Amino acid sequence: MEGTMSSCFRGMLMKLRFSELLNNISSFEKKVNNLSDIFSYGCLISVNGLLLEVIGLTAPIGSRCYVERIIDGKILNISAEVVGFKKEKTLLFSLEETYGVFPGTRVFLKCFKNTYSITGKIPLSTELLGRVLDSKGRPLDGRSQLNPKFFTFLKSNVVNPLNRKPITEVLDTGIRAINALITVGRGQRIGIFSSSGLGKSILLGMMAKYTKADVVIIGLIGERGREVKDFIENILGSNGLSRSVVIAAPADVSPLLQIEAASYATSIAEYFRKKNKHVLLIMDSLTRYAMAQRAVSLSLGELPVSKGYPSSVFSKIPILVERTGNTDNYGSITSFYTVLTESEEDPQDPIAHICRSILDGHIVLSRHYAELGHYPAIDIENSISRVMPNIISKKQYSQACYFKKLIASYQRNRDLINIGAYLKGTDSTLDHAIKIWPILERFLQQKQSEKSSYLSSCEELNQIFI
């Protein structure tokens, strides 16, 4: 009996060991399959800023490479991406500081069976909601690494213009002045034109918290690191972050990473749009995205044509912006892009000019209002929504136009009014503006903690003119 039990036990033990062996072999096969087939490499011959020139390496544009460097006697790698060619040279743009590289250092290209090279896969998933990530999808919030089922490559998805659904619905932004006077449609692309210190970040935070949208994607491109944290913790808040995805590429990272962050934020918005969600995309700022494109283009030897910007930059902005909007059979992406202007007197710098021409409207922030403590500091006279007449009632449109007329009349004659030189009865429109000016000012101002729905905004506008 004991011999039989011992024999059975040995048999079971052998089966378990054999099963373990099979599992180990299977695991080893997976690891072998994931190994690179080859590591091709070239030699570094020149470094100019973040631009690297390499010989002996053939790779398509967009390929991810690894450059050796020596720091404290240790050989480490930095990441770089192929951005161009020049005769027998391959041009790479470094994603990190080039400290520690040396002439003749090896530059590796990792190749696989089914792909020529690694171009960088970025995670896409509903798990991204509530997270703060960098341009590669790596966590910046100290939480666990993402492990989504879906990935994307950073490429531009061209939308057939005949597949774009018309803008017919009003988007409730929760901001009274915008809802009533610069009404935005679902799927519209709007520029927020502002110089520094005018409350741009506060306005964006209010939009992110109060806008009626299923998902909010926020791209912080080229901002100061301190401002990124301040925006997330103090302006957006935990409630706003819960339905948002924040992609941050601060000013101290490589221009190429800033470009990829803008594209990644747009890719996430496209992902949720395909899931039939109404997406709000906020990008701060489109100007810094253009500056990053300029840095890469100038490194490649392109000639500047307007205020230091090469011509290729002006084609990159429409490619990014045109990915948003409405599409048939899917949801929508309503996008707000901040555009930094040098001054209100001369806003027609090349980036501001191209943005005005391709966007569906613009909201201008005024330094005059900001200095008076008037927030949000929206310059109603110079702001416009191109789709507004098509999505609101005729009554609201006429009231909004008359409101703007009163504001413009008062502002043009402000100095005369302040010194008492204006004679009452000279201009009936100005008389009306002077009479209700405190009401107009109160309507345009809104506390950061205050939310004003579209219906209540229209009702308050209507009450002014009863």
Curated annotation (Swiss-Prot):
Similarity annotation: Belongs to the ATPase alpha/beta chains family.
InterPro entries: AAA+_ATPase (IPR003593), ATPase_a/bsu_AS (IPR020003), ATPase_alpha/beta_chains (IPR050053), ATPase_F1/V1/A1_a/bsu_nucl-bd (IPR000194), ATPase_T3SS_FliI/YscN (IPR005714), P-loop_NTPase (IPR027417), T3SS_ATPase_C (IPR040627)
Positions of ATP binding: S194, S195, S196, G197, L198, G199, K200, S201
Localization annotation: Cytoplasm
Name the record gives this protein: Flagellum-specific ATP synthase
GO MF annotation, one: proton-transporting ATP synthase activity, rotational mechanism
Cell division in keyword set: no
Keyword Cytoplasm on entry: yes
EC number in record: 7.1.2.2
Reaction(s) catalysed (UniProt annotation): ATP + H2O + 4 H(+)(in) = ADP + phosphate + 5 H(+)(out)
PROSITE patterns, sorted: ATPASE_ALPHA_BETA
Role description: Probable catalytic subunit of a protein translocase for flagellum-specific export, or a proton translocase involved in local circuits at the flagellum. May be involved in a specialized protein export pathway that proceeds without signal peptide cleavage.
Keyword field: ATP synthesis, ATP-binding, Bacterial flagellum biogenesis, Bacterial flagellum protein export, Cytoplasm, Hydrogen ion transport, Ion transport, Nucleotide-binding, Protein transport, Translocase, Transport
Name of the coding gene: fliI
Entries under CDD domains matching the protein: ATP-synt_flagellum-secretory_path_III_N, ATPase_flagellum-secretory_path_III
GO cellular component, one term: cytoplasm
Principal subcellular localisation of the protein: cytoplasm
Gene Ontology biological process terms in this record: bacterial-type flagellum organization; protein secretion by the type III secretion system
